[in-house]
Amino acid sequence: HPVRVEQQRSVADALVAQKPGDVCFAYVAKNTDGFASVADADLLRAMKLLLLEGKLLCEPSSAIGMGAALRGQLPLRRTDKVCFVISGGNVALEQLHQLEDVRL
């Protein structure tokens, strides 16, 4: 069942919510095998890797799947086929400056 949590700050501001909506929660509960919590540092690392290696500028929220994979939080094998949906448009200049300090 959905649980209300304390409001958090994150570079992935599009994903921050105190409580999921009932329809969204029901869909996710039915169609997923698990969840992963991804730190801002991992989101920024994924963003930088996508920018430098893939030439893709993405918003932090869309880097969450890749951030979890880079951290080893997804049960993936080298032979698995994986798809992450990457989008842009919600990138603040401050976030781009933060990428300068991120180590790959």
What are these regions (language model features)?
Residues 1-104:
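PLP-dependent amino-acid enzyme catalytic core
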